[in-house]
Curated annotation (Swiss-Prot):
Name of the protein: Ribose-phosphate pyrophosphokinase
Residues noted as binding D-ribose 5-phosphate in the record, renumbered to the chain: 195, 219, 223-227
Coiled coil: none
Ligand binding (ATP): 38-40, 96-97
Its job: Involved in the biosynthesis of the central metabolite phospho-alpha-D-ribosyl-1-pyrophosphate (PRPP) via the transfer of pyrophosphoryl group from ATP to 1-hydroxyl of ribose-5-phosphate (Rib-5-P).
InterPro entries: PRib_PP_synth_CS, Pribosyltran_N, PRibTrfase_dom, PRTase-like, Rib-P_diPkinase, Rib-P_diPkinase_bac
Amino acid sequence: METPIKIVAGRSNPELAKKIAAYLGTPLCDAKAENFSDGEISVNYFESIRGSDMFIIQSTNPPADNLMELLIMIDAAKRSSAYRITAVLPYYGYARQDRKDKPRVAITAKLVANLLTQAGADRILTMDLHAPQIQGFFDIPFDHLYSSVVLIDHVKNMDIADNLVVASPDVGGVKLARKFASELGTELVIVDKRRPKANVAEVMNIIGDVKGKNVLLVDDMIDTAGTIVNAAKAIKEAGGLKIYAAATHPILSGPAIERINTSVFEKVIVTDSLVSEHDFCSKIETVTISNLFGEAIKRIYDGESVSYLFDSKNISQKITNHH
């Protein structure tokens, strides 16, 4: 008997879950998560999931409730005899706390890995981890997708590739920016910033030439937008022409929207890994990653290679030809 597939939506990003289910041609599993009056979370599956291959879709931002809800959904699935449970985290929260960067602090990324595994996840599927080595915090299969294949495709269709350079807003993002530069056939520029204290970014010097060029700043996330907006300002002052940004995760906390609205950016391209308030910002454009996740889930379910999806040529063919 064939193992049935079940796609479950947590409350963090129901729209993305719907799109993924539509890509797979399967309805969302009949399930409900709700809060009791004291704030405790209750999860209920209203259909049999015994023996099913389950994919629970939940980004963990804001972290506390969404992570707890995901753990409870996994626990309920395990106790209902699901055959295999894959936790699908388009955005993996707490990934920035991946090591002890000062004395007497937690390694929360590892704690989250332990919690997911202990709750009963058999496999993890996520995208653009802030620190890729977090994969090693797990002793279960871990599939790590890259949004760059989707974002690069989008940039190629924007008619800005002429006279373009790709920039990293800090030294840590060079690897990601290099991938964009390589795929787009452009030079790479680095903005070397020093951060005096948490959530305060200070731009220093630009390594590379931006004078008279269009510039695409690339990052894995935009949180308060300080880093990327300051980098754009520095590039503009150094003679950059039109400035764009591409980032995977639109956390957009605190003053982010206001900063982007008043920034020198022409456009800021993000994915729908998170639901955010960017409707209030005309500069932000969203590209869906639903087909990328849909294809990855299909491949995991069918026992096929997921690394096939790391190549943008495969992605373009696969997910744009899919109806």
